Amino acid sequence: MVVLISSTVTICNVKPKLEDGNFRVSRLIHRPEVPFFSGLSNEKKKKCAVSVMCLAVKKEQVVQSVESVNGTIFPKKSKNLIMSEGRDEDEDYGKIICPGCGIFMQDNDPDLPGYYQKRKVIANNLEGDEHVENDELAGFEMVDDDADEEEEGEDDEMDDEIKNAIEGSNSESESGFEWESDEWEEKKEVNDVELDGFAPAGVGYGNVTEEKEKKKRVSKTERKKIAREEAKKDNYDDVTVCARCHSLRNYGQVKNQAAENLLPDFDFDRLISTRLIKPMSNSSTTVVVMVVDCVDFDGSFPKRAAKSLFQVLQKAENDPKGSKNLPKLVLVATKVDLLPTQISPARLDRWVRHRAKAGGAPKLSGVYMVSARKDIGVKNLLAYIKELAGPRGNVWVIGAQNAGKSTLINALSKKDGAKVTRLTEAPVPGTTLGILKIGGILSAKAKMYDTPGLLHPYLMSLRLNSEERKMVEIRKEVQPRSYRVKAGQSVHIGGLVRLDLVSASVETIYITIWASHSVSLHLGKTENAEEIFKGHSGLRLQPPIGENRASELGTWEEKEIQVSGNSWDVKSIDISVAGLGWLSLGLKGAATLALWTYQGIDVTLREPLVIDRAPYLERPGFWLPKAITEVLGTHSSKLVDARRRKKQQDSTDFLSDSVA
């Protein structure tokens, strides 16, 4: 329905003046005639009544378009949306949402975001579909269908004999034989005595072994049936995803970088904070699950989101109507399996709560330590979230990029046995693009939302390429490397960080590096540190990879650090470098240090996470991972071979010249 309000030509009542700034003279200009019309349209949709009001100028594009849904007015959305916002009306745009990352999919242009290829249905021959995983048929003995047919023929003959016997017995009974007579009992006893010496074929009979005795006989038909049942279990995950998710799932990287550059940034305040202030219904409970990486807590802690949540809670507390439905915050520290085993759970819990409070987080309803990879704490977390959310709650999972949100949700769905499409997981920042609404994990009508990772530009890992990022990523339990450092010495952590001990009230201090073992180290004199960096950065000091790669990461800046402690054995303070790891200092006295790293990288001083150092000390000089040693060895061998060939060539040329 469209209602035309006015189509008249209006004339401006205001007489605009054009002022000359040089001579301050106001000159009158003619009144322009503006062809103008306005109107209303009413569009019915399945779930809500939508009214659209459009203000436009004739023969021109739309000036402004607003949309009213159930009385709430907001700017009308464009039909060229790229990412899902997790709203019910997202499904009404006629676009397919990628279940892996939340982007609207399209099959027109492969260079645009959300491209996917439609699946081709191919009829497979069932006779050729004989591939079954070995573990699915473990404990079964394979039997051919030909043998089954022979057995079926034998069974038919046996059935005929039994049938004839039964018919004969019936005729005998009709002739006066009594089944319950003593004569029948005597015959049964005689038969039992005759069969006492017989037993079923067992181990040692023919080719029957203990393994074959334990196995169950399975025919080819039954094998196909088992394969189909196993395929049905995974059918819920056999869905179409965008080309980006396909590349991340199968190759661990984004192949189309041109489409990646067209993706807009995620606006947390507009898309999430405003929805937390106004819940979808008065009876629904809002639960915010904040996911933080344990091995990079300060780098992955979403400070901006925590600040927004704190403001939301303050507004809700001041509002008497909304004070009943305050958002509940649950902090989940993931990847606890990567931390050293000597950290007690109680101490880790206190440390996490203290760091969250220092980061600006509001009051926490609960704190959970979880490992989605090793299934630690997932069951208890799921039970607590269900209890908080209730039957109609909304659970928002937020966190920094690559903090493990999608991995956690996949673990929750497996623990609950919910048939939910697997979210895309990859060691690449920004895997999830749009807000994904996930049903089936929580009870009744409660919903869970997976949100895009929040961008933290101060992370060291964001400066690196994919190969360098793999080197700094901690994938196994982090192991310490400790040095005893004197004043005037420096420790290089790859080509990314340098720590100088400028002065100290004691002779030496202990510095322990907690980072990936793929990152090389070096301990030497501070006076030679600059020369070491220029000569070995990108070669022995990796990452970065490449001789001139360090200059592409930015300029170095110095940060002065004052520390003090009362024990060499117990660490006094941690220096956290966002996106890389942390350094622990142990000393008995005071010291002044200088930390060098690239400009813009976040460096945080905090209480120590691990109070112990490594059981042994590293020697001065280079500490090189095996991979770098092999590469350098191959490179050195090539140089030696090249020099030997050049020397042989020079000798040959000299002899040739002498003969001539």
UniProtKB/Swiss-Prot annotation:
Pfam families: MMR_HSR1, YqeH-like_C. GO terms for molecular function: GTP binding; hydrolase activity; mRNA binding; rRNA binding. Keywords: Brassinosteroid signaling pathway, Chloroplast, GTP-binding, Hydrolase, Nucleotide-binding, Plastid, RNA-binding, rRNA processing, rRNA-binding, Transit peptide. Induction: Induced by light, but repressed by dark. Up-regulated by the specific inhibitor of the biosynthesis of brassinosteroids (BRs) brassinazole (Brz). Residues 127-158, 191-212 are annotated as: Disordered. Its main location: plastid. Mostly expressed in stems, petioles, leaves and flowers and, at low levels, also in roots. It is found in: Plastid, Chloroplast stroma. GO terms for biological process: brassinosteroid mediated signaling pathway; chloroplast organization; chloroplast rRNA processing; developmental process; positive regulation of carotenoid biosynthetic process; positive regulation of chlorophyll biosynthetic process; regulation of DNA-templated transcription; response to absence of light. Residues 273-457 form the CP-type G domain. One of its GO terms (cellular component) is chloroplast stroma. Residues 1-53 form a transit peptide. Binds to chloroplast 16S and 23S ribosomal RNAs. Belongs to the TRAFAC class YlqF/YawG GTPase family. Required for brassinosteroid- (BR) mediated post-transcriptional and translational regulation in the chloroplast, including accumulation of chloroplast rRNA. Involved in chloroplast differentiation. This is GTP-binding protein BRASSINAZOLE INSENSITIVE PALE GREEN 2, chloroplastic. It comes from Arabidopsis thaliana (Mouse-ear cress). The gene is BPG2.
